[in-house]
């Protein structure tokens, strides 16, 4: 998997951006939807066209006024502004029925300053004159693409042009090695940690096909082990960046997490553990990625501050007791070297292999030590277990009445597997499957009474044959 190009849909409210989003993604299920404090005005979805793949962003509406007065900041929400800057391609959606109004012109002027490909979509052309889209030539952004997104008309033509220069997913060449993503809020020291991790190693820096302009893969070797560092902090090394662009970038973080084997989340010790840090940990866990936490700028704290942060870690990280937390100074290198053993253990845990026999034995040992509860007088039986996947590891347990197994007992089994196999830093998915009954939900289930009835019926038939179907000739007839 490579990091995909990003296409942002922008425009005034109610011009059809969400409808076009659904046409692109062919689903109403967004990759990320309404994450508190982060994506209030945006949702993200995966889109494909032929052998091309990209991420589409549906931004909030821009421009409530229609008099053309004021500058772009009067029209644009902060979240939409950020989405536009993190996109590779802009699709500017306008309303062909309403015609061009002042807000459209202001947005058009702003788009001219970005230096990014912009495609103007004149939506809602159904029921208007064929010449209506021509009005939007005045934006100076090229030919408007006529569309009726609600009916899917014109969507294919736009996708063909939009994806023309995107790389084929079949031809993307991935670098080899453990993929390591460094994520965190702005100014927590990600760039400093990246440089410290790379050290003086000879590295090859290159832009992979299909990556966003702000993310690069950096292959390097340390102690004979190949790594690929996914760097999303590169945008901050390109001179002065507008303050609004420096806001937390959800999409770059999500892409880095999805494409990684292990994610290192960097937290600023001076600011403490904030909700956004926990959101990012949640992203990594939801994606099933192995995780290591680095509390940066630790050496700048007083003894009292360090004690306070340790108490906060115990309180706020209590839902991830299996994740290793390191106190480091990326600037001075203190504790950075200790990250590597934790990264490797987390990766090995996420990819661990074990035989079905061994896994089933561990399951039976756990059940013997602490049997499952009874349901309606019958004890739940867990019969065998096997590996069902990696990164994250999946353990599949088969048995009867598994749907009635309490959450507390499921956690007990997960903890038993973690302890026995020493799994560190990775989520573990334990899946329960019900043994299939071929007679389930059928009216002819063979109960004991029915079986007896069937046997009696067969005996009756045999008796009828012996009494009614006697031979039609006698021994006397045989002699003839």
UniProtKB/Swiss-Prot annotation:
A molecular function (GO) term: ribosome binding
Keywords (A to Z) from UniProt: GTP-binding, Nucleotide-binding, Repeat, Ribosome biogenesis
Positions annotated to bind GTP 2: 184-191, 231-235, 296-299
Gene3D superfamilies membership: 3.30.300.20, P-loop containing nucleotide triphosphate hydrolases
GO aspect biological process, one term: ribosome biogenesis
Keyword Hydrolase: no
Residue ranges, compositional bias (Basic and acidic residues): 455-480
Binding of GTP 1, residues: 11-18, 58-62, 123-126
Domain KH-like, residue spans: 352-436
Disulphide bridges: none
Comp. bias intervals (Polar residues): 438-454
SUPFAM superfamilies per the UniProt record, alphabetical: P-loop containing nucleoside triphosphate hydrolases
Keyword GTP-binding: yes
One Pfam family this sequence matches: MMR_HSR1
Region (Disordered): 438-480
Residue ranges occupied by any EngA-type G domain in the UniProt entry: 5-170, 178-351
Subunit composition and interactions: Associates with the 50S ribosomal subunit.
Main function: GTPase that plays an essential role in the late steps of ribosome biogenesis.
Recorded family membership: Belongs to the TRAFAC class TrmE-Era-EngA-EngB-Septin-like GTPase superfamily. EngA (Der) GTPase family.
The protein's name: GTPase Der
Protein's organism: Psychrobacter cryohalolentis (strain ATCC BAA-1226 / DSM 17306 / VKM B-2378 / K5)
């Amino acid at each position: 998997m490579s990091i995909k190009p990003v296409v942002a849909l922008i425009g005034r409210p109610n011009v059809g951006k969400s409808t076009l989003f659904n046409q692109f993604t062919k689903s109403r299920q967004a990759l990320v939807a309404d994450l508190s404090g982060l994506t209030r005005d945006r949702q993200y979805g995966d889109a494909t066209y032929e052998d091309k793949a990209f991420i589409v962003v549906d931004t909030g509406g821009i421009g409530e006024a229609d008099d053309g007065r004021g500058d772009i900041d009067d029209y644009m929400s902060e979240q939409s502004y950020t989405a536009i800057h993190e996109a590779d391609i802009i699709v500017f959606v306008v309303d062909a029925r309403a015609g061009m109004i002042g807000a459209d012109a202001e947005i058009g002027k702003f788009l001219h300053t970005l230096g990014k490909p912009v495609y103007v979509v004149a939506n809602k052309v159904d029921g208007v004159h064929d010449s209506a889209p021509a009005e939007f030539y005045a934006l100076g952004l090229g030919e408007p693409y006529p569309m009726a997104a609600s009916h899917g008309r014109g969507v294919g033509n736009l996708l063909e042009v939009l994806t023309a220069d995107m790389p084929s997913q079949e031809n993307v060449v991935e670098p080899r090695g453990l993929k390591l993503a460094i994520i965190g809020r702005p100014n927590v020291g990600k760039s400093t940690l990246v440089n410290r991790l790379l050290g003086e190693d000879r590295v090859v820096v290159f832009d992979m096909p299909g990556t966003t302009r702000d993310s690069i893969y950096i292959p390097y070797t340390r102690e004979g082990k190949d790594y690929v560092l996914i760097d999303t902090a590169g945008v901050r090394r390109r001179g002065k960046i507008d303050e609004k662009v420096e806001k937390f970038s959800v999409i770059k973080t999500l892409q880095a997490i999805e494409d990684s084997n292990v994610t290192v989340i960097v937290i600023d010790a001076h600011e403490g553990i904030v909700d956004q840090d926990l959101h990012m940990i949640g992203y990594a866990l939801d994606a099933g990625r192995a995780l290591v936490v680095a509390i940066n700028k630790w050496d700048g704290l007083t003894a009292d501050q360090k004690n306070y942060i340790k108490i906060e870690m115990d309180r706020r990280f209590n839902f991830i007791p299996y994740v290793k937390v390191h106190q480091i100074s990326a600037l001075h290198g203190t504790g950075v070297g200790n990250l590597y053993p934790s990264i490797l253990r987390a990766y090995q845990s996420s990819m661990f292999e074990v035989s079905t026999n061994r896994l089933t034995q561990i399951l039976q040992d756990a059940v013997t030590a602490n049997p499952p509860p009874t349901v309606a007088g019958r004890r739940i039986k867990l019969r065998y277990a096997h590996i069902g996947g990696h990164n994250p590891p999946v353990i599949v347990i088969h048995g009867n009445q598994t749907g009635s197994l309490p959450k507390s007992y499921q956690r007990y089994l997960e903890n038993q597997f973690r302890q026995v196999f020493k799994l560190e830093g990775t989520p573990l998915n334990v899946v329960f499957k019900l043994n299939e009954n071929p007679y389930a939900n059928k009216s002819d289930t063979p109960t004991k009474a029915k079986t007896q009835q069937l046997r009696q019926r067969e005996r009756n038939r045999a008796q009828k044959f012996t009494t009614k179907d006697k031979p039609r000739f006698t021994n006397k007839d045989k002699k003839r």
